Amino acid sequence: VESPQIRVEQKGSYVWDPPIKDLARDLDKVRYRELSVDRPGTEALIQRADEVFGDLLPPRIQGSFWWTMGLTWEAAKLIGLEQLMMYMYDDPEGLHRVMEWVSGEHMHFIKWFETEGLLTRKDGAQSVGSGGLGCTDELPQPDWHEGGPARLIDIWGFAESQETTGISPAMFEEFIVPYQVPLMEEFGLNCYGCCEPLHQRLDPVLRYIPRLRRISGSPWVDQEIMKRKIGHDFIFSRKPNPTQICTMFNENQIRADVRQTLEIAGDGPLEI
């Protein structure tokens, strides 16, 4: 299903023209993605790379880390961001149907990768989540076979819900988390959060997300609340404000920002 973007000239902002305008009429028309893999093309690419630099750096097939099991990005593309918010009031049962469908579609997506043997390990120096490395001795599972494809339970999972930053923690707990949890159950370890200020909705994340290890601390998070709630039990994945180097460079301000994080969370698992 295509979700055309309607763009304006100012700052590159845009909105979607959602394909689903009427839930009762349109939702039953959408279907899961049809997935395929080009194995001959992949093998040809590997052979070409091996011919060029294989004596220096043997090429290998490595799957990328997908974005994201958060669901609300795709839900917003289907029904529109405003409607995603408004249906929580105007048509809660309809929104539950939307979220159930999107969750099921994502389950279809990840299970296909597993069935086709396309998953690869992410427990080394690979990027996982919204920032951080996958280094861990908890993955893969003890029954993983050396040299074989990874399973979902052998790799990191990741979810977030940046699009719903403006809703209440209660609505987040009702409409979002229950549809993320079945997906997160499939993975060996999990990361949660990206640029949303998670301190406002951290309780249901800690309560329901299984095997959680890494929690995002965005530039807009209250670090003291975050640290108090996660203690030493999870990695505090801190994202300093990028505008400090993108639009200006004030070394004192940058140092002060990092110093504040170290003072608040430096005594526990922390990555910046």
Q: Where are each of the predicted segments found?
A:
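A gly/proline- and charged-residue-enriched helix-loop-helix capping module
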Residues: R7-D50
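Active-site loop segments of alpha/beta catalytic cores
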Residues: R33-I272
